[in-house]
A protein has these predicted regions:
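Conserved beta-loop-beta element that borders a ligand/cofactor-binding pocket
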Residues: 140-164
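NAD(P)-cofactor binding segment of oxidoreductase domains
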Residues: 63-104, 140
Length: 291
């Protein structure tokens, strides 16, 4: 029986845990909040509380699991400030033993802006936002820790995640504007169930050992095209259009950071080398499955 530990068992982690349970694995789900622990328990996953924002103390210790026998997934985002990831540092300090593999969920944001150009895993990261820089620092920390401990690792650079309860339906209902189609630039995304499939492959494939893997559907549709497709399929009004400059002037810095960069992310390592068959490479199919 495989042993799985999911640190940060939230939106993606719950689905990943369910997939592993269906394959007969034992699954531990780690979360920092009580409400999340309830969701983990309801999913049939063993819940464990671990506050990575606080130093170790009584009642806030690393999970008591057989780390040596486990595939460990780390899905916790870095804190919203700083240049490093103290949450990850506390986690790695609490791991006793040598997991079979450590899989870290990072972001394609580490590549920065390429003006719509194509990037793959050999592209030198050039993060433009503090959030992406913290992710890249975390990747470096994972690599250093794994090398020192002799642990297999895989970094998944994940594009924007959509799925059930993660479609912009309320935005469309509010009539919020989108960038004019002629000014909208390529973006990248992945349906959550395909992300789970990628996570499973990253945990077990020999071709994922000590590798970085991009996770996206390869569609490169702009944010505007995505909104238009969601509106059409969900039977909602299409959004009004504004210029790119007007959108930048009205959006928060955080929101604009997702639209101000453009790149086409190559996913051939995922689909050809790891052999992941994406169920939702067609956006329309993915959107319908997410409603």
């Amino acid at each position: 029986m495989r042993s799985i530990v999911i640190i940060g068992c939230g939106y993606t982690g719950l689905r990943l845990g369910a997939r592993w349970l269906a394959q007969g694995a034992s699954v531990v789900g780690v979360a920092m909040r009580g409400a999340s622990l309830d969701d983990i328990s309801l999913a049939g996953i063993t819940p464990v509380a671990w506050n990575l924002d606080a130093p170790p103390r009584d009642g806030n210790c690393a999970p008591v699991v057989d780390w040596d026998a486990s595939i460990v997934y780390y899905c916790v985002p870095p804190p919203p400030a700083g240049s490093a990831d103290p949450r990850l540092a506390r986690c790695l300090a609490g791991v006793v033993g040598r997991p079979q593999r450590l899989v870290y969920l990072s972001t394609t944001g580490v590549y920065g802006d390429h003006g719509g150009g194509r990037v793959d895993e050999a592209t030198t990261p050039a993060p433009r936002t503090p959030r992406a820089a913290r992710r890249l620092a975390a990747e470096t920390a994972i690599n250093a820790w794994a090398q020192a401990q002799g642990v297999s690792w895989c970094v998944l650079r994940v594009a924007g995640i959509y799925g059930p309860e993660r479609l912009p339906l309320e935005r469309l209902r509010r009539g919020e504007p989108a960038i004019r189609p002629e000014e909208a630039t390529p973006t990248n995304r992945i349906q959550v169930d395909d992300l789970v499939t990628a996570c499973v492959a990253a945990g077990v494939s020999s071709r994922a050992d000590r590798r970085i893997v991009n996770v996206c559907d390869g569609s490169d549709a702009s944010s505007t095209e995505f909104l238009l497709r969601v509106a059409r399929i969900a039977g909602l009004p299409a959004p009004p259009f504004v210029s790119r400059a007007a959108a930048q002037a009205t959006l928060t810095a955080s929101a604009w950071s997702f639209l101000g960069e453009s790149r086409r992310v190559d996913n051939r390592r995922l689909t050809e080398e790891l052999g992941v068959a994406l169920a939702f490479h067609d956006l329309d199919v993915g959107i319908r499955a997410s409603l």
